[in-house]
Amino acid sequence: MLRLSDEVETGINLATTQSIGEQRITGGCLAITVFEGTAEHTESRHTETRALLSARGGTSLGEKPAKAWEHGRFDAPYLRDALLSAGALCETLETATTWSNLATLKAAVTEALTTALTSTGTAALVMCHISHVYATGASLYFTVVAGQRGDVAEQWRIAKNAAAQAIVANSATITHHHAVGTDHRPWMTDEIGDLGVAVLRAVKQTLDPA
């Protein structure tokens, strides 16, 4: 497992030693790696990974950040409602693309979200991390926090639409693991083409015509 946070998300983690460890770190991006298997296998992978990252200027923080992430990885979603009640907009979205397109996509979606949210006069915090990695590419997971302005659902719809347009414009998938749902329906043709939509409609009509 590899999770790589961008500078903004890492900065949030730097605010507490419970997440980052005791070492004094002033910037950069936090990478968390976890391996499964026999003790010999996992130690070998950890040793190889540490060597690769160290050779490129990385600093090992030990096991504490990974253990903190494992312990609290499912806690963050429960903060959403509390933040909404406190007057903050908090939402997430995700996408995926090839390695060669990853940095361009990340910059485009970050800019789209930031512009859409700050245009209403509120500050916005847009965080991103790589959540899944593959031989050919990776998934980008964005977390957005901003002050509420008017109808919060409409505020997010505008930001989400801007992000989706950036995703489509940069030839990425409209969703990696959150699935399609009604939120992504407007971009289904961009995602799978006219033929793909026709196939889905034919299957629906045949198996579930009601």
Where are these regions (language model features)?
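Generic secretory/membrane-interface signal
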Residues: V126, S171-A172, A202, D208
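Long, contiguous binding/interaction regions
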Residues: T110, R157, Q165, I174, ...
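Short acidic/histidine-rich active-site segments
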Residues: T173-V180
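Activity-critical C-terminal alpha-helical subdomain
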Residues: G181-A210
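C-terminal substrate-recognition/cap domain of FAD-linked oxidoreductases
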Residues: M1-A162, N170
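Conserved acidic catalytic centers in enzymes
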Residues: T98, H178, D208
